C-alpha cells in the first residue's frame, strides 16, 4: 500500500524539479511551466495530507490553488504572447529593454 510518505516524497521531488527549472531557465514560457509543476506538487501534498487526516481542508486548498493557477496561466500566456510579438524573444535577458 502506498503511504503518506510516498506521496510527500513525490510531492517534494516535483517541487524540487520545478524550483530547479525556475532557477536554471531563462525562457519565460519555461518559467511558467516550472511554476505549474511547483503548484501541482503543492496540490499533491495538500491532498495526500487531507486524505490521511480525513479532513477536507487540504482538498479545498488544492481547489483554490487550481483556480489561481488557471488564472495565472490565462493572464501569463497572454502577456507572453504580447511580449513575443513585441520583442521576438522569450528570454528574460530582454526584460532589460523595459527599463526606462
UniProtKB/Swiss-Prot annotation:
<protein>
    <recommendedName>
        <fullName>NADH-quinone oxidoreductase subunit K</fullName>
        <ecNumber>7.1.1.-</ecNumber>
    </recommendedName>
</protein>
<feature type="transmembrane region" description="Helical">
    <location>
        <begin position="1"/>
        <end position="21"/>
    </location>
</feature>
<dbReference type="GO" id="GO:0042773">
    <property type="term" value="P:ATP synthesis coupled electron transport"/>
</dbReference>
<keyword id="KW-0874">Quinone</keyword>
<dbReference type="GO" id="GO:0048038">
    <property type="term" value="F:quinone binding"/>
</dbReference>
<keyword id="KW-0472">Membrane</keyword>
<keyword id="KW-0997">Cell inner membrane</keyword>
<feature type="transmembrane region" description="Helical">
    <location>
        <begin position="28"/>
        <end position="48"/>
    </location>
</feature>
<comment type="function">
    <text>NDH-1 shuttles electrons from NADH, via FMN and iron-sulfur (Fe-S) centers, to quinones in the respiratory chain. The immediate electron acceptor for the enzyme in this species is believed to be ubiquinone. Couples the redox reaction to proton translocation (for every two electrons transferred, four hydrogen ions are translocated across the cytoplasmic membrane), and thus conserves the redox energy in a proton gradient.</text>
</comment>
<dbReference type="GO" id="GO:0050136">
    <property type="term" value="F:NADH:ubiquinone reductase (non-electrogenic) activity"/>
</dbReference>
<comment type="subunit">
    <text>NDH-1 is composed of 14 different subunits. Subunits NuoA, H, J, K, L, M, N constitute the membrane sector of the complex.</text>
</comment>
<dbReference type="Pfam" id="PF00420">
    <property type="entry name" value="Oxidored_q2"/>
</dbReference>
<dbReference type="InterPro" id="IPR001133">
    <property type="entry name" value="NADH_UbQ_OxRdtase_chain4L/K"/>
</dbReference>
<keyword id="KW-1003">Cell membrane</keyword>
<keyword id="KW-0813">Transport</keyword>
<keyword id="KW-1278">Translocase</keyword>
<comment type="similarity">
    <text>Belongs to the complex I subunit 4L family.</text>
</comment>
<keyword id="KW-1133">Transmembrane helix</keyword>
<feature type="transmembrane region" description="Helical">
    <location>
        <begin position="64"/>
        <end position="84"/>
    </location>
</feature>
<keyword id="KW-0520">NAD</keyword>
<dbReference type="GO" id="GO:0005886">
    <property type="term" value="C:plasma membrane"/>
</dbReference>
<dbReference type="GO" id="GO:0030964">
    <property type="term" value="C:NADH dehydrogenase complex"/>
</dbReference>
<keyword id="KW-0812">Transmembrane</keyword>
<dbReference type="InterPro" id="IPR039428">
    <property type="entry name" value="NUOK/Mnh_C1-like"/>
</dbReference>
<keyword id="KW-0830">Ubiquinone</keyword>
Amino acid at each position: 500500500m502506498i503511504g503518506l510518505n510516498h506521496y510527500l516524497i513525490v510531492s517534494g521531488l516535483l517541487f524540487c524539479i520545478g524550483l530547479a527549472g525556475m532557477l536554471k531557465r531563462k525562457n519565460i514560457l519555461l518559467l511558467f511551466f516550472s511554476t505549474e509543476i511547483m503548484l501541482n506538487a503543492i496540490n499533491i501534498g495538500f491532498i495526500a495530507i487531507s486524505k490521511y487526516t480525513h479532513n477536507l481542508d487540504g482538498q479545498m486548498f488544492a481547489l483554490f490553488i487550481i483556480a489561481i493557477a488557471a488564472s495565472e496561466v490565462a493572464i501569463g500566456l497572454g502577456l507572453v504572447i504580447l511580449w513575443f510579438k513585441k520583442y521576438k524573444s522569450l528570454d528574460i535577458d530582454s526584460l532589460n529593454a523595459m527599463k526606462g
